[in-house]
Structure formats: structure tokens, C-alpha cells
A protein has these predicted regions:
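Redox-cofactor binding/interface segments in oxidoreductases and associated redox assembly factors
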Residues: 23, 39-40, 100-104, 152, ...
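Portal/gating segments that form or line small-molecule/metal binding sites
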Residues: 51-107, 119-121, 193
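Core dinuclear metal-dependent hydrolase active-site scaffold
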Residues: 1-33, 85-146, 160, 209
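Active-site metal-binding motif and surrounding structural segment of the metallo-beta-lactamase
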Residues: 26-72, 146-151
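Short, acidic/turn-prone active-site loops that include or flank metal/cofactor-
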Residues: 27-28, 44-45, 68-70, 87-91, ...
Length: 209
């Protein structure tokens, strides 16, 4: 279930199932060109990197992005034919993978305003539902998430802190949780362990970086 999940760095995630899906590829070390699907949560540099898209995409890769990024995609190297634009609440199915865009936004911060309609994703593949939160705080929308594996930001400043992310994990209670978005662009290297310690004996936390 969580063995298929790699956190390559920061919020750059790769999930391998019957499709290979990347989320927000960033600082990718190797050129793999193995992505069946790439999902981008929003257009900040550490989530939408043309250099890193080029390392993982191939001629058949499908790119999923927020509708608000439409004007930013002309240099993505992915044609409109292979691009899906989504807003929070939208659902689609690609090659047998169910993808739902869910809200991702800050409360009381200006970094990720709700009106931008940036997203996280609920992805169901091989009968497992993964939640990739994107850059978000705890809000009324994310409290409703139902998933098997939750990948949540824990680095604070632009997103939830480790303590807040642990609070959210207890609310939505996934079978496993993976901390992301710490130790580089934001947060401290120990934030992942802080998150894990707070959920000890409550939720299975898997440290992937």
C-alpha cells in the first residue's frame, strides 16, 4: 500500500502501481521518462518545475493541473491533447486511475489563497486511495478527506506545521501517513520525526525522506 510511494524530495512524490504517477516533480536526480501521469498541485517553483517535468515525462504522459495554471502551461512541453485542467471537486479517470481534485489553501496566510483554486489530489489506483495534500492548512474541506494513505505537508510557514498535520491525520485517520514538504524549502529536517512521534500508537507513519 505505502511501499509503492516514494518521496523523491520536498513534495515531489512518485507512486508506482498499474500506472506510474508523479506529483509536483522537483529536484529529480535521474531522467526516467517513465511517467504515465503527472499531477501538479499549483504553480509555485517548488511544485511546477519545467526542468523536472522534462526529466520524467515522455510522449504519452498526461499532465493534470489546476485550471488556474492554464496560461502557465505553454512551456510545459505537453500538448493540450495530453493536458487535463481541473478545479477543486473535479473528478476524472485516466487509464483506470481515478483522480479527484480537492481544495488546498491556507487559513490566515497569503501564500495559497482559496480563490486561486489550487488543489491537492485523491488518487485511487489498485484499490488504494492516496491523498496528496498539496500546500494546505487544516480547513473545513480537508477535514472531510477519506483515504488509505495520506501525504501531508509538515514544514510550516507555507503549510501546516508537524503538530497541525498530526492533528489533521487524527481527524481523517488514514491507514498510513507520510510527511512531506520539510527539510529544504521549508521546515526542519526533524519535522518528519516530530510528526511521527505525535502519532505514535495512533497511525502508522512512514518516513520516506
Amino acid at each position: 500500500m505505502y511501499e509503492e510511494v516514494q518521496v523523491l524530495t520536498h513534495s515531489s512524490i512518485r507512486i508506482a502501481g498499474n500506472q506510474i504517477i508523479y506529483f509536483d516533480p522537483f529536484h529529480v536526480e535521474e531522467e526516467t521518462h517513465d511517467a504515465d501521469i503527472i499531477c501538479v498541485t499549483h504553480e509555485h517553483f517548488d511544485h511546477y518545475s519545467l526542468e523536472d517535468l522534462a526529466k520524467v515525462k515522455n510522449a504519452a504522459t498526461i499532465l493534470v493541473c489546476p485550471k488556474s495554471m492554464k496560461d502557465s502551461l505553454s512551456n510545459s512541453g505537453v500538448s493540450e491533447e495530453f493536458t487535463e485542467l481541473v478545479a477543486p471537486g473535479d473528478e476524472l479517470e485516466i487509464n483506470g486511475v481515478r483522480i479527484q481534485a480537492v481544495p488546498a489553501y491556507n487559513i490566515g496566510k497569503q501564500f495559497h489563497p482559496q480563490q486561486n483554486q489550487w488543489v491537492g489530489y485523491l488518487v485511487t489506483m489498485n484499490e488504494v486511495t492516496y491523498y496528496i495534500a498539496g500546500d494546505t492548512d487544516i480547513n473545513e474541506d480537508v477535514k472531510k478527506i477519506q483515504c488509505d494513505v495520506a501525504m501531508v505537508p509538515v514544514g510550516g510557514t507555507y503549510t501546516m506545521t508537524a503538530e497541525e498535520a498530526a492533528e489533521l491525520a487524527e481527524m481523517i485517520h488514514p491507514k498510513a501517513a507520510v510527511p512531506t514538504h520539510y527539510g529544504s524549502v521549508a521546515g526542519k529536517a526533524e519535522d518528519g520525526q516530530i510528526f511521527a512521534d505525535m502519532l505514535k500508537d495512533k497511525i502508522n507513519v512512514i518516513l520516506k525522506m
